[in-house]
Amino acid sequence: MRMKVSDYIARKLVDEGISDVFMVTGGGAMHLDDGLGHEPGLHCTFNHHEQACAIAAECYARIHNKIAAVCVTTGPGGTNAITGVVGGWLDSIPMLILSGQVRYDTTARSTGLGIRALGDQEFEITKAIDCMTKYCEMVIDPMRIRFCLEKALYLAQTGRPGPCWLDIPLNVQGAYVETEELLGFDKNDYEAGGTGWSVHGTGCDGCGLCAGKLIQGKPAMIPEDEAGKGEKRELLPPSVSLDLAREIVKKVREAKRPVINAGNGIRIGKAFDVFQRVVEMLGIPVVTGWNSLDCMYDSHPLYVGRAGHMGDRPGNFAVQNCDLLLSLGSRLSIRQVGYNYPTWAREAYVIYNDIDAEELKKPTVHVDMPVHADVRDLLEKMEMVLEVEAVSADGGPKDKEAVDWWISRCQQWKEKYPVVLPKHYEAGEDQPANIYAAIKEISRRAEEDQITVVGNGSPCVVGGHAYEMKKGQRFISNSAIASMGYDLPAAIGACLADHTKDIILVTGDGSIQMNLQELQTIIHNHLPIKIFLINNGGYHSIRQTQKTHFHEPLVGIGVDSGDLSFPSMEKLAWAYGYPYVAAHHNSQLGEAVEQTLATDGPVICEIFVDMEQNFEPKAAAKMLPDGTMVSVPLEDLAPFLPEEELAENMIIPMIKPQ
């Protein structure tokens, strides 16, 4: 069938199961805009900034592991999308970005000269995004379009997921091709070390048409095709053997103080259900991490807490005191192991699972048993082993009494050290609300199976501390790049990915300014997003940093530095057409949250909070008597406990800061 390339792309996306596209139109993508916008099988959401498109698509993919496409124009269209793409790259989120480009004969690359640009608004985006994509290519041959699309979609979702980007010049977008002549991507050839070119088209058996495209048995590819391509070959993990699964189960059964560290790879790897079953079969404590809060609900009897640099006391006490740590689907970043990483889980036998073999080699993590495996495959094999051993006489832990004591100890930590404390509710009518009380009031009213998205800064940190997860809930943040401005577009992506319940968004007065224009996208599309805006007078995370490490006056913080200001959110709500709710004191929190959640459609609830409330607990440097600042182990979180109390919580020997 004769078809324009841009129309073929649109139809191909639908055939591959994609139903949503986030885009900002532009002249450099005019054929793509036309093809995607008129494809009946695609729902196009038109944002007001390309960064918002990319962030929305990233969050969309987090909800049900389904890709949404992004379409932007040449030059600034592509560069604007970069922050959202690097967020997907670092957090291992599958994405497909399509960008328009000037006609190939007006690109600097086509001249062979060292000029910066030739065409109008030209920028060779592939050179900029090679470091944040699994595969990128400027598609200069219309006959490669099927291959490039299939390759991009395969790589984005295979192994460790991540973004793939195709840059498509105008002359290629508008070219016509016979779709039967297009050659596809052969994943088997690719994984065997080949290029992935299918020798023949679909259903073809050595026809003359395909033979005419071959050069010495290979499809015709010229060096110019390779010049605009970036690609990272990935070693896919082998299938997990039952012997390996059995060895892991054996190690867990032999431990007296085992704990599971559940990472977000469990969600990304579609392993959530089997993870829940394996946890019940193993019957050992579980901690979650910075971006994996929703791997287990808080009231589960085996859930302990959140571990890591921004974790809580129960979670870190469990990790630091364990004698075996089974880490599943977590890359164990610095935020998980802390800056004093030699002291992390220092007396534990560490079984470290990751789908990326390179992550297992990091010098910041001590590993006794590295497990290069797809977490779903690993858990399914462990489940098979456990199902067999469950009916045998020795199916449980070797020392059941010790493990039962350990589970009880973990629950004691959980009960003794809640994040939200009575003091957070003490503020009177003459004082601002407390952010910990605010997060508590929002989370206790959120429903099961509801999605909460948080912006970066206070909502992410305090939300990560204090949000009480219920069954089926999702808690979405971008943890690695942690860009301000994530909030509104991420909530849009989550809302379009899941229509079953209203979306809760918790963001800050600083972060929301970075993509404020997306308030219009929400209101235009009638998206039921409940926006809780934490007003702490500016950039509270940086305020704390400057107060801790530098002298006043503060710089570039907000109301207390005097050199940065923010508009009235009440007036902005009116301008954009949002209902507006406000809470100035703790006593107003409950009613304000309930009113917001009961409002039909999008709504803004502004909560004015105390600017003096620091994040707590958190990892922090400790000053020695001689004035030296040192990073302490993760069991010793600020505000620091008395040494006697800390010692009471340690089963293993304490380390004296020095």
Predicted features, each with a name:
Residues 132, 441-450, 573-578:
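A structural motif corresponding to the C-terminal end of an alpha-helix
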Residues 1-390, 445, 528-531, 551-552, ...:
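N-terminal alpha/beta PP-like core and its mobile active-site loop of ThDP/TPP-dependent enzymes
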Residues 26, 269-272, 276, 316, ...:
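Conserved structured core elements
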Residues 38, 98, 106-120, 309, ...:
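Thiamine diphosphate
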Residues 6-9, 14-19, 24-27, 32-39, ...:
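Active-site diphosphate/adenylate-binding microenvironment
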Residues 143, 192-197, 201-231, 235-239, ...:
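Phosphate/pyrophosphate-binding active-site segments
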Residues 24-26, 45-55, 70-77, 140-141, ...:
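Active-site nucleophile and cofactor-binding loops and adjacent substrate-binding regions
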Residues 336-339, 347, 382-387, 395-398, ...:
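Hydrophobic, well-ordered secondary-structure segments
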